[in-house]
């Protein structure tokens, strides 16, 4: 069942989770409007029996509760990081206390949207995209074997990784180890940017280019999400109907962050060229002005010399 993302900020968003072709849904997702900003979390659980569902639910609930209890003045980045660390501890503790939940864990993607920027963090192979139209401004890099060991070294392409039989071999997850040290990224944003948080059942269903086209700005978040879910379901049915759970949140940012976005390489080059042209034009104009002034000065000097010569001749004539 889809859920609108409530926020006091100028954003519009929707999140949803579907069972796919599996007997149960181990994904979880949630959001809340807090004093620090809007928190959105999407998780993909794993583990026998109900372990995956339990782990993903603990992660979503813990992170949202911890961020919601924070007060204005606390560092959003630190609050988000500590909330994820706490979620890891809670899942690990629960798995240790209940034998049937041994080995459970979950991936996580979370964003804390503030006026200053978007604070983003992830664990595992669920993803965060920041899109500007169809341009990919930011994307998390999966904590998985195929990405960390193969794609990062140029051994295989991202599309080959998506189709690999080892694509589900993840290197990090909440609840698997006793401690975890998540990274938090500060993402400046422009008005019109779109955030997509999703599990691998969502992004792994089709080539990335097709996915970005499907969730791009031609549609509002609700239509974009529904259209993409329909595509994923149809692809899953064609491929045998045993496709994974898939969950996602799509959020439109309808204002600009207080922290300014950095210029990309292409923009920097363009600015440099324009600056050079402007400077060159200025130098040429100054040179021309200086050159035009010189004949005037020379002419004045010649006129002065002529006047002096006339005066001298007059003096001579008077003497004679």
Where are the language model's segments positioned?
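PP2C/PPM-type serine/threonine phosphatase catalytic domain
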Residues: 1-320
């Amino acid at each position: 069942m889809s859920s609108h993302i409530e926020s006091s900020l100028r954003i519009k968003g929707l999140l949803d989770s579907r069972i796919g072709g599996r007997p149960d849904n181990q994904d979880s997702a949630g959001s809340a409007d807090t004093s620090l900003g809007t928190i959105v979390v999407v998780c993909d659980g794993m583990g026998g029996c109900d372990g995956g569902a339990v782990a993903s639910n603990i992660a979503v609930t813990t992170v949202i509760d911890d961020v919601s209890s924070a007060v204005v003045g606390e560092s959003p980045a630190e609050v988000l990081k500590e909330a994820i660390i706490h979620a890891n501890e809670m899942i690990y503790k629960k798995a240790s206390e209940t034998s049937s939940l041994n080995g459970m864990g979950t991936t996580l993607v979370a964003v804390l949207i503030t006026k200053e920027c978007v604070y983003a963090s992830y664990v595992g192979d669920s993803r965060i995209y920041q899109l500007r139209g169809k341009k990919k401004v930011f994307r998390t890099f999966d904590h998985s074997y195929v990405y960390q060991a193969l794609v990062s070294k140029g051994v295989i392409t991202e599309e080959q990784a998506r189709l690999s039989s080892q694509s589900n071999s993840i290197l990090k997850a909440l609840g698997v180890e006793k401690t975890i040290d998540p990274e938090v990224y500060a993402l400046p944003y422009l008005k019109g940017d779109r955030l997509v948080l999703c599990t691998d059942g969502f992004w792994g269903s089709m080539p990335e280019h097709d996915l970005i086209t499907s969730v791009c700005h031609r549609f509002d978040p609700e239509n974009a999400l529904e259209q993409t879910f329909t595509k994923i379901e149809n692809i899953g049915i064609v491929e045998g109907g045993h496709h994974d759970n898939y969950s996602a949140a799509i959020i439109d940012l309808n204002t600009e962050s207080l922290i300014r976005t950095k210029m990309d390489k292409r923009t920097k080059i363009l600015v440099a060229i324009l600056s050079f042209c402007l400077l060159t034009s200025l130098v040429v104009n100054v040179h021309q002005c200086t050159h035009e002034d010189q004949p005037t000065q020379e002419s004045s000097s010649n006129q002065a010399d002529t006047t002096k010569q006339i005066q001298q001749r007059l003096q001579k004539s008077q003497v004679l």
